[in-house]
């Protein structure tokens, strides 16, 4: 795994789209589907077959038999009518290929959302670590102050132990947060298939009023339904007339025969044949048609459900965005209030007006509100990304704005 020094969210996303292993695998599958389509693109072209055979008769040969016969042939064939089977196969592969292209875009969109979520989760944990590190510095300073007072018999040991316990708990919290941060960084590095060393703060553009568009997932489902429609045509084609045209040129060579009797053996023959076949009775084809029809019906129901689901997700994403904005404004006020209360309590604590329980409670509320505010800032960015992509907008146009 190589190392990149990507700093912004956009740089990490671009690197991920280029190097992600799953995306590479999907691209290979798309190429396979394209080759499958190209393989049937010229399905109506004539076929040409060449061959040769040799036969030898031993024992009890009659005078009118040839001992050794060699044959070479060239056969040209063309299907004049196959009940629409070849055209259906061609269309089916075309629809499957385009469904794969849409599926690739869907996978890339989902990957971008994963990266955005992980990026801002990493920022949240990093911001929280800084908040608790600041808390640790404050606790350490207060611990040293109280320890000095204890040494000169101006306070009791429980004051010292309470601050020491709070400080040690804070250090454990920081260690736990660093583990979470490391886990998230490894996850985003796995997606990018590269080790990322640094994460700068990035914000997404403010979201304007978006309208719901059909997503690439919907487009892929529509292509798959069309492909299943062609499967029905393929299954039905066996119950229609089949007309073929064949022309065979045969060259013969002989040895070990009575040339006095067999004087008119042919050396060259050309045979033109037009064949018409019709399937009068076939129970298996009827079942194949029914299976294909049911599969198409199931896909249509799945499409209807997915459309309703996307509409619901879009509405919820918009509601979530508005809720996160309200939460952000509320927490901003809470942070200001917590900071103000803490400053007042600190002065009272240092002057012995309130005890350490009141002081630590004020400090904890201040730290808690600051951590929540940092988290809300990052969750707001995640909500923006979800709103963008749940609208069905093309991920490429979104990235251009970021």
Question: Model segments located where?
Answer:
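A glycine-/polar-enriched beta->alpha junction
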Residues: 17-24, 31-46, 74-92, 102-109, ...
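Membrane-embedded beta-strand positions of outer-membrane beta-barrel proteins
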Residues: 26, 48-52, 93, 243-247, ...
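Periplasmic alpha-helical coiled-coil/stalk elements that build and connect Gram-negative outer-membrane
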Residues: 2-7, 11, 108-219, 223-226, ...
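Short terminal targeting/anchoring segments
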Residues: 156-158, 353-375
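Acidic, low-complexity, intrinsically disordered peripheral segments
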Residues: 5, 372-402
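A short glycine-centered flexible hinge/capping loop motif at secondary-structure junctions
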Residues: 150-154, 349-353, 390
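Small/polar, glycine/serine/threonine/aspartate-rich low-complexity segments that form flexible
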Residues: 51-80, 89, 246-281, 400-402
């Amino acid at each position: 795994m190589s190392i990149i020094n990507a700093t912004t969210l956009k740089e990490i996303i671009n690197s991920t789209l280029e190097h992600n292993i799953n995306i590479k695998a999907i691209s290979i599958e798309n190429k396979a589907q394209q080759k499958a389509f190209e393989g049937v693109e010229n399905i109506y072209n004539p076929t040409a077959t060449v061959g040769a055979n040799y036969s030898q008769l031993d024992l009890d040969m009659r005078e009118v038999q040839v001992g050794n016969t060699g044959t070479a042939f060239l056969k040209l064939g063309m299907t004049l009518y196959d009940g629409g089977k070849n055209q259906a196969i061609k269309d089916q592969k075309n629809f499957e290929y385009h469904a794969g292209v849409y599926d690739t875009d869907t996978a890339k969109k989902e990957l971008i959302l994963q990266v955005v979520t992980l990026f801002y989760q990493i920022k949240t944990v990093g911001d929280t670590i800084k908040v608790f590190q600041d808390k640790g510095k404050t606790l350490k300073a207060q611990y040293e102050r109280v320890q000095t007072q204890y040494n000169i018999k101006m306070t009791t040991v429980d004051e010292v132990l309470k601050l020491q316990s709070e400080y040690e708990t804070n250090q454990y919290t920081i260690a736990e947060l660093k583990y979470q941060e490391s886990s998230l960084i490894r996850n985003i590095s796995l997606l990018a298939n590269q080790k990322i060393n640094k994460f700068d703060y990035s914000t997404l553009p403010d979201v304007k009023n978006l309208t719901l568009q059909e997503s690439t997932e919907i487009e892929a489902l529509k292509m798959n339904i069309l492909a299943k429609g062609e499967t029905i045509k393929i299954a039905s084609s066996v119950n229609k007339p089949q007309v073929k045209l064949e022309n065979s040129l045969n060259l013969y060579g002989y040895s070990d025969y009575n040339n006095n009797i067999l004087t008119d053996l042919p050396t060259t023959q050309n045979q033109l044949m037009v064949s018409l076949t019709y399937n009068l009775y076939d129970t298996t084809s009827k079942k194949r048609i029914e299976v294909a029809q049911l599969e198409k019906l199931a896909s249509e129901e799945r499409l209807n459900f997915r459309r309703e689901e996307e509409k619901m997700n879009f509405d919820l994403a918009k509601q979530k965005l508005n809720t996160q904005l309200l939460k952000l404004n509320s927490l901003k006020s809470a942070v200001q209030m917590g900071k103000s209360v803490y400053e007042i309590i600190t002065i009272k604590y240092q002057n012995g007006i309130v005890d350490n329980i009141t002081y630590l409670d004020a400090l904890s509320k201040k730290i808690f509100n600051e951590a929540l505010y940092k988290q809300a800032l990052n969750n707001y960015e995640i909500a923006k990304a979800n709103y963008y992509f749940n609208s069905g907008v093309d991920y490429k146009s979104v990235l251009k704005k970021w």
